[in-house]
Each structure stands twice: as structure tokens, then as C-alpha cells.
From Swiss-Prot:
A 7-bladed beta-propeller torus, about 54 by 55 Angstroms, with a depth of about 25 Angstroms and a central pore. Residues 1-36, 37-67 form a transit peptide. This is Photosystem II stability/assembly factor HCF136, chloroplastic. Essential for photosystem II (PSII) biogenesis; required for assembly of an early intermediate in PSII assembly that includes D2 (psbD) and cytochrome b559. One of its GO terms (biological process) is photosynthesis. It is found in: Plastid, Chloroplast thylakoid lumen. GO terms for cellular component: chloroplast thylakoid lumen; photosystem II. Belongs to the Ycf48 family. Keywords: Chloroplast, Photosynthesis, Photosystem II, Plastid, Thylakoid, Transit peptide. InterPro entries: PSII_CF48-like_dom, TAT_signal, WD40/YVTN_repeat-like_dom_sf. Pfam families: PSII_BNR. It comes from Oryza sativa subsp. japonica.
Length: 416
């Protein structure tokens, strides 16, 4: 097939280097003045009402913010950013060797940098990303040690080996199938890159050469196996709507129309398609802290896979410590159960786990939900209801370092 041949043709992509506070005062009665007259009571009440009219009543945990100060939330605070209101924030990462140093990406050629743990951010100019008349959408950033990677659309790949002090641009082949949507630093001079057509590439020499980890794009796989039994998969020509990677290198992706999903794990030659377990179309999917899957549907529903989501098949070997997999390597359970959520009818767009039990979900019109039982039940953080933005992404980079990314330049930081 032409698509397969094209992917093999680029198995190795040869790349060259480059407040005022006011309390409601109610007079306290003295023991010797219990017989205070009706006239005195009316006067005291009027005084209290006038005092209340002078300034607003301040509620605990939600102080009124000045015009130049962002509002406080129960467990999150908003961080003001020096960017245009229309920017959508897309990814964030910190340098492992310097946790106070991080980068924030977005649309409209947005790259922001912090050197104080995310308290303040400033624009970062990268000359090699400004040579052309493109308005880049920077999709993904990842660090390991001092080595980092940034990818964007139109196709652009940036690499640093000094914790982001300097960046070099690495040219890419014009024949790369699809748009780059995700990159993960995996080791010294090594990274893994994914496109929205399902191509996965790995490099071990700073991006100068890339090797295909799958034999063909998703559309080629699905159109070759038209009898797969996956609803909406036959004659598939779309791309991924979302793709998420587990800590151990497994991927789950949602088709562009949300009518099915796909999984892949290291060693598989192809992506594996799966029927969606619910009637409504899928919005997003990702990995729980226990290894299972969470699934969001359009309209605000949230589902959790039963068990860990994976059922492994082992082949008996002479060496009892060796494990291999039958084909297909894994069977993903398609058995999901719905969780109890209060999203006010707004769609939930992403979920991020802080621990095995605690997670946060975010969505349209400032919806922010919390679970403390692994996702079975969720409670809305009402303090976030006044945020006039869609919250697209929840990212926990450690137990106490978490961020919510939204449109209109909205960034929330976890303060616990």
C-alpha cells in the first residue's frame, strides 16, 4: 500500500542540525440594658445597614480581588500571564535538574518561561523559531535532565541540551505523515514523537535520525482491515482528536469523530482499534494512576474502565522470568462504568491524577471537579465557576505541582 510504503520510506528521517474588609456589626446587649426600646433597636439596625453598604461582605477563602490581582480558588490560584487574551495554552514542563525552571506553550507562537517555580512567567524568544512568517502553534514540550524538546505546527522541532538556555531547530522531512502533536524525552539524546495520523518515531541521536516504531499510519491499518468490526473504522481517513501516553509508554488515542478509540504499546506493529463502550461520542481518554483508563464523552459524562484496563496474555517459556505476549499483545477491556459528576451540563475536557485517589477534571466555562476516591464520585469546586474560560488540560508534574491550562491565557496553579 502506498501509505505503508511511504512510512517505510521515511523509516529513517535524515535530519540536519539545526481589599477593604467590612464586618456586619450587630450591637451586643449588656445585662443592664435588656429593656432597650424599639426606637433604639431601629437606630442600631440602620447603623449596621449603613456599614454594610460601605463595603462588600467578604466571604472566607474567596477574597475580592483587585483589578490587578487574580481571584483565589479553594485549592488553585490563577497566574496572570503577559500574553494576548486569545491565546490557548497547550502544554507545560519543568526542567528536572532545576524544578524552578519551566516552559509554557500555546497558540500564536507563544513560548513563556519561568525561573521561580511558576510564580511569574515572561515571554521567551527563540530566534530559530522566528525566521519564517509562520504563526506557530506549539503543541508539546518535554524534558529529561537538561535535555528538552518542543514541537509545533506547522512542522517545527526544537532541541536543547542546556535546560533551555539555548535552542536549536532541527529540520524535518516534508514527507512526515501528519502533524506532530506530542513529544516525550525518554533518555539521553533520545525522544519519542507522535503525529495525528498515528505515526510514532524514536530517536537516540538528538533528533538527527528517526526510526518508525509502527509499520504504518492508522488510516492504512484500518482500511486494510475493513472487517475489524470497529464501528466507524472502515474507510477511515481522519486523524487523532486526542492522544495520551502512560508513564510506561502505552498510548490511547481518540478518533477525530469520537466514534472509536485506539491503543498502542511498545512492540506492537500496529495501533489496535476498539469500539466505544458508550452511546455518546468520545471527547477524550487517558490513563488513571492505577493503570486503568478514564473516558470522557461529549456532554459531560465521565466513565472509568473496570480493573486496570489491560488484560495480559503470557506465553509459557523455559525461562520462568521471561515474559512475552501473544498476538495481539494486549486486549483492552471495553467494559466501562459511569462515575457520578456534577458538571452543570458543560463538557469535561480533561482529567489529571495527583495520586491514586485524588484527581481533578476540567472543562467548559470554568468547570473544575475533584475526586478523592479514585474517580468514583466527583465534587465541583464552585470557586472556579467565575472563570470565564474553557479549561482544556490538567497536568500534575508531581504531588504538589499541578496546573490547569485554558483558553484566553488562563493558567491555574495548584496550591493545595
Amino acid at each position: 500500500m502506498a501509505t505503508t510504503a511511504s512510512l517505510h520510506l521515511h523509516l529513517h528521517l535524515l535530519l540536519s542540525s539545526s481589599r477593604r474588609r467590612c464586618r456586619l456589626l450587630v450591637p451586643r446587649a449588656h445585662t443592664d440594658s435588656i429593656s432597650t426600646g424599639r426606637r433604639r433597636f431601629i437606630a442600631d439596625t440602620a447603623t449596621a445597614s449603613a456599614a454594610a453598604a460601605v463595603g462588600p461582605l467578604v466571604l472566607p477563602r474567596t477574597p475580592l480581588a483587585r483589578a490587578d490581582q487574580p481571584p483565589s480558588l479553594s485549592e488553585w490560584e490563577r497566574v496572570l500571564l503577559p500574553i494576548d487574551p486569545g491565546v490557548v495554552l497547550l502544554d507545560i514542563a519543568f526542567v528536572p535538574d532545576d524544578p524552578s525552571h519551566g516552559f509554557l506553550l500555546g497558540t500564536r507562537q507563544t513560548i513563556l518561561e519561568t525561573k521561580n517555580g511558576g510564580n511569574t512567567w515572561f515571554p521567551r524568544s527563540i530566534p530559530s523559531a522566528e525566521d519564517e512568517d509562520f504563526n506557530y502553534r506549539f503543541n508539546s514540550v518535554s524534558f529529561m535532565g537538561k535535555e528538552g524538546w518542543i514541537i509545533g505546527k506547522p512542522a517545527i522541532l526544537l532541541h536543547t541540551s542546556d535546560a533551555g538556555d539555548s535552542w536549536e531547530r532541527i529540520p524535518l522531512s516534508a514527507q512526515l505523515p501528519g502533524n506532530m502533536v506530542y513529544i516525550k524525552a525518554t533518555g539521553e539524546q533520545s525522544a519519542e514523537m507522535v503525529t495525528d495520523e498515528g505515526a510514532i518515531y524514536v530517536t537516540s541521536n538528538r533528533g538527527y535520525n528517526w526510526k518508525a516504531a509502527v509499520q504504518e499510519t492508522v488510516s492504512a491499518t484500518l482500511n486494510r482491515t475493513v472487517s475489524s468490526g470497529i464501528s466507524g473504522a472502515s474507510y477511515y481517513t481522519g486523524t487523532f482528536n486526542t492522544v495520551n501516553r502512560s508513564p510506561d509508554g502505552r498510548y490511547v488515542a481518540v478518533s477525530s469523530r469520537g466514534n472509536f478509540y485506539l491503543t498502542w504499546e511498545p512492540g506492537q506493529p500496529f495501533w489496535q482499534p476498539h469500539n466505544r463502550a458508550v452511546a455518546r461520542r468520545i471527547q477524550n481518554m487517558g490513563w488513571r494512576a492505577d493503570g486503568g483508563l478514564w473516558l470522557l464523552v461529549r456532554g459531560g459524562g465521565l466513565f472509568l474502565s473496570k480493573g486496570s484496563g489491560f488484560q495480559f496474555f503470557y506465553r509459557g517459556l523455559n525461562d520462568a522470568h521471561a515474559i512475552s505476549y501473544l498476538h495481539p499483545p494486549n486486549q483492552i477491556t471495553e467494559d466501562f462504568e459511569e462515575a457520578s459528576v456534577q458538571s452543570r451540563g458543560f463538557g469535561i475536557l480533561d482529567v489529571g491524577y495527583r495520586s491514586k485517589d485524588e484527581a481533578w477534571a476540567a472543562g467548559g466555562s470554568g468547570v473544575l471537579l475533584k475526586t478523592t476516591n479514585g474517580g468514583k464520585t466527583w465534587v465541583r469546586d464552585k470557586a472556579a465557576d467565575n472563570i470565564a474560560a474553557n479549561l482544556y488540560s490538567v497536568k500534575f508534574l508531581g504531588d504538589n505541582k499541578g496546573y490547569v491550562l485554558g483558553n484566553d491565557g488562563v493558567l491555574l496553579r495548584y496550591v493545595g
